[in-house]
């Protein structure tokens, strides 16, 4: 799958699903997936997990092992397929609207990878929340 196809599929899913996300998220995913050979598998898993979240609702979905609460505001969605990929998407809920916002995607290799990813996610969350004030 080439870059344009991947970006088109990501944009189509994010738009169609109504998932609120930081504008940099598709770029995060593109840089993680481009030329990896796992693009289609990842997208299938990502769509499946978002659909599952919608069906179960927040309370039940976040009880699943793929979801992890990082702190008071930030959560992690773990999308993996054995040794093929181990991608995390950090998200939060908007402080005013309560809407879930996908903030930042990264490839988790070590637990230290979270440190910089959390900083990026909070910067993006602050940007989005400042825009609504």
Set out the residue ranges of the language-model regions:
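A short, basic-hydrophobic beta/loop patch
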Residues: 102
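Basic, Lys/Arg-enriched alpha-helical interface segments
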Residues: 1-86, 95-99, 107-133
């Amino acid at each position: 799958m080439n870059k344009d196809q991947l970006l088109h599929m990501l944009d189509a899913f994010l738009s169609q699903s109504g998932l609120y996300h930081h504008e940099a998220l598709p770029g995060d995913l593109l840089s993680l997936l481009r030329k990896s050979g796992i693009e289609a598998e990842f997208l299938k898993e990502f769509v499946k997990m978002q659909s599952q979240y919608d069906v179960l609702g927040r309370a039940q979905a976040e009880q699943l092992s793929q979801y992890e609460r990082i702190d008071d505001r930030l959560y992690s969605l773990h999308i993996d397929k054995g040794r093929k990929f181990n991608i995390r998407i950090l998200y939060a809920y908007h402080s005013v609207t309560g809407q879930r916002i996908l903030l930042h995607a990264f490839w988790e290799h070590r637990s230290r990878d979270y440190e910089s990813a959390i900083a990026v996610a909070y910067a993006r969350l602050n940007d989005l929340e400042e825009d609504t004030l």
